[in-house]
């Protein structure tokens, strides 16, 4: 295990030699981090979380209780995984057929949030700051700031970087976050851009 001395690991957690955990990260009760897993700085790994070899977790990620992050899953910086959300890594699993060579990559991009008990089908690519509602089942590719709900999940609107549904507009027709007052421009082709803060920069 390659760790900074500032890492907090609960005595009941199992952290295998050969994983990497960044400074300021906390690994809580009964969690298991396998050799080959990579976890960034200042993350929270909740109770009963499994992080597989080959899983990649960025900085400032929060993973709530009872989540398994499998090989092939990448969580970029600032991602939030709600309690008991689920990742898959093959589309047609069988106990008697090995499909380890068929694992599909799943990417959850910067700042996205996965609601409690949501399921992410392998191969999904969820855009920055998108939000998946509790209990939704989501697959495929979705844009930044998409609000996704239902089974199967569908996009029903947009959310701001602060997590609010965007409905109000300013005088120029841009969507307006009720908390930050950041403005968002709807682009041709079904994408959204924040006009007041770069998407790849931390909030002030």
Show the residue positions of the predicted features.
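Flexible, glycine/small-residue-enriched loop-and-beta-strand segment within the central core
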Residues: 2-11, 16-21, 26-126, 151, ...
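Short, intrinsically disordered, charge-biased short linear motifs at domain edges
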Residues: 135, 144-150, 159-169
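Cys/His-enriched microdomains
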Residues: 155-158, 173-175
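Short cysteine-rich clusters marking metal-coordination/redox-active sites
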Residues: 160, 177-180
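Short, non-ligating residues that shape and space the ligands of small metal-coordination modules
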Residues: 168-169, 183-187
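Short cysteine/histidine-rich zinc-coordinating motifs and their immediately flanking basic loops
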Residues: 171-177, 188-195
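Short, intrinsically disordered terminal segments enriched in charged and Pro/Gly residues
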Residues: 194, 198-204
């Amino acid at each position: 295990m390659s760790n900074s001395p500032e890492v907090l690991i609960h005595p009941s957690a199992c952290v295998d030699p050969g994983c990497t955990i960044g400074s300021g990260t906390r690994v809580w009760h009964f969690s298991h981090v396998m050799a080959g897993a990579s976890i960034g700085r200042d993350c929270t790994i909740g109770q009963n979380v499994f992080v597989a070899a080959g899983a990649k977790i960025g900085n400032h990620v929060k993973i709530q209780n009872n989540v398994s992050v499998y090989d092939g899953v990448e969580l970029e910086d600032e991602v939030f995984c709600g309690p008991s959300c689920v990742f898959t890594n093959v589309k047609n699993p069988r106990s008697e057929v090995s499909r380890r060579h068929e694992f599909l990559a799943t990417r959850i991009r910067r700042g996205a949030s996965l609601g409690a008990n949501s399921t992410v089908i392998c191969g999904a690519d969820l855009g920055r700051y998108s939000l998946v509602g509790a209990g939704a089942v989501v697959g495929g590719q979705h844009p930044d700031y998409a609000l996704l709900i239902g089974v199967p999940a569908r996009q029903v609107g947009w959310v701001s970087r602060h997590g609010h549904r965007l409905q109000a507009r300013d005088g120029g027709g841009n969507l307006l976050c009720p908390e930050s007052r950041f403005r968002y421009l709807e682009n041709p082709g079904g994408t959204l851009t924040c006009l007041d803060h770069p998407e790849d920069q931390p909030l002030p």
